[in-house]
Amino acid sequence: MPVKGLKVEAASIDPGHDAVILNPRDAEHLGVVAGLRASVVCRGRGVGAVVIVDPRVPERVAQLTKGLVERLGDCDTVDVHPIDVPPSFDAFKKRLSGARLSAAEYKMLIADIVAGYYDDAQIASFLVSQLYSKLADEELEHLIRAMVETGEVVKFGEPVYDVHSIGGVPGNSKVALLVVPIVASRGLLIPKTSSRAITSPAGTADTMEVLAKVAFKPQELHDMALRARGLIVWGGALNLAPADDIFVRVERRIGVDPPTQMVASILAKKLAMSVSRLVIDLPTGRGAKVQDESEAELLASMFLAQAGRLNIAMRVAITFGGEPIGFSVGPALEAREALQTLMKGDGASSLVEKACSLAGLVFELGGVVPRGRGYSLACEILRSGAAYRKFREIIEVQEGDPDIKPEDIKLAPKQFTLEAPRDGIVTMIDNRAISLAARAAGAPEDKGAGIQLHVKTGYRVRKGDPLLTIYASSDTRLHEAVRLLDEYNAVLIEGVVVKVLP
């Protein structure tokens, strides 16, 4: 029998997951066990949480972690009781065995995962099962729709456009800061929801946050988008497909990102934003998530198959991802480069060509221009200053300063410049080394940290020329970033003469 009406207090600890902290006497009376899960119920809605027992907690008090409070809402009291086997457990075991699940089974399973009735080990096994027992197209559609149904859906009453990159390439987060205003300047609605960085030095939301606020409620997002026609906001504050946030957290811990789950997560978020016209960017190359073109084409076919099922008009671009995009890596540095490019109407070819190519595909999807003409229109909008003017509107509607200049953006105070050890030609810039070093320097948590590149592949350099500059806020972080660059040989320089034969 559950103890009724435990008084709610905020927990002073954050174990990294939803937890309820109880006095040992209450835990014993409830029949709940430390380390296992219990259902915490507020106004008839139950959420699963790990039980922690602490004698310092007063009796008949339930201390709730911050995330649990946010999920339950405003509650003065809660009931706590042991979790029985969730209704979806048979479906869960069925999926682990490799059998297919129905739409109803996925709906029940995802609802129970969101409610907290599965622990991280069980969720990890669900994710790993997709590696050795791939989801069929119909089953993947069921998963996507179930993920959408458990969260908010924002509706706009008109066609919604978006561009989504699977990421994995340093410097990629700033591309959206060009694409969105280019597209929005022609009146197309592109309220882009973006993630924070997971394993990279900057996510699009991290970079945009240097310039404006990115966390808004669904109704705020709706109203702002209709005013500015374009937004760049953080999706994590919107409760869109909340199962995705759970899956991402577990994927980070186990180092697994099944392709089917990647497709499901991306498309569920897009459906929750009522996106009906979507461009997918698959960066491909050494050090990217996708290593070669054949792998990219396989992933593209998965996206396109689901697009047909979900009534999304889609095009997939396989883009070069063999080295960083543009010259900057890290939130503040990337915000600077994006702003400079918009103000000048030109910039690094890898950044401008990618942004205009993706924006051009959106124009073609929307019927603004015929196929093959989108790129030139996007470039014209960028060069004319129309994209910069629209970006100022977006910054202002997101409560930022539209008059901000690149030089106003502060960088971390500690610097180290890596110099060329010899004359030669830059033959490789290692994505992994750049990402690791930028994160070691403090990015993305320290927005001013990161790496500014001074060269790209193909540049001719002389001994002592600057190759890149690292920015960090402490000597410790700076030294670790330098160590990683040296260990991984981040910038490879070859002599002009490769070999001499007699």
From Swiss-Prot:
Gene3D superfamilies linked: 1.20.970.50, Nucleoside phosphorylase/phosphoribosyltransferase catalytic domain, Pyrimidine nucleoside phosphorylase-like, C-terminal domain
Catalytic activity: AMP + phosphate = alpha-D-ribose 1,5-bisphosphate + adenine; CMP + phosphate = cytosine + alpha-D-ribose 1,5-bisphosphate; UMP + phosphate = alpha-D-ribose 1,5-bisphosphate + uracil
Alphabetically ordered keywords of this record: Glycosyltransferase, Transferase
InterPro entries: AMP_phosphorylase, Glycosyl_Trfase_fam3, Glycosyl_Trfase_fam3_N_dom, Glycosyl_Trfase_fam3_N_dom_sf, Nuc_phospho_transferase, PYNP-like_C_sf, PYNP_C, Pyrmidine_PPase_CS
Entry EC no(s): 2.4.2.57
GO cellular component, one term: cytosol
Single biological process term from Gene Ontology: pyrimidine deoxyribonucleoside metabolic process
Gene Ontology MF annotations: 1,4-alpha-oligoglucan phosphorylase activity; AMP binding; pentosyltransferase activity
Top-level taxon: Archaea
Active-site residues, Swiss-Prot/TrEMBL: D257 (proton donor)
Keyword Lyase annotated: no
Enzyme kind, highest EC tier: transferase
Residues that hold AMP according to the record: G168, S195, R196, A197, I198, T199, S200, T204, S265, K289
Record-stated family: Belongs to the thymidine/pyrimidine-nucleoside phosphorylase family. Type 2 subfamily.
Entry-linked PANTHER family: THYMIDINE PHOSPHORYLASE
NCBIfam families (UniProt xref): AMP_phos, ARCH_P_rylase, PRK04350.1
Record's function text: Catalyzes the conversion of AMP and phosphate to adenine and ribose 1,5-bisphosphate (R15P). Exhibits phosphorylase activity toward CMP and UMP in addition to AMP. Functions in an archaeal AMP degradation pathway, together with R15P isomerase and RubisCO.
HAMAP family hit by this protein: AMP_phosphorylase
Protein name: AMP phosphorylase
Organism of provenance: Hyperthermus butylicus (strain DSM 5456 / JCM 9403 / PLM1-5)
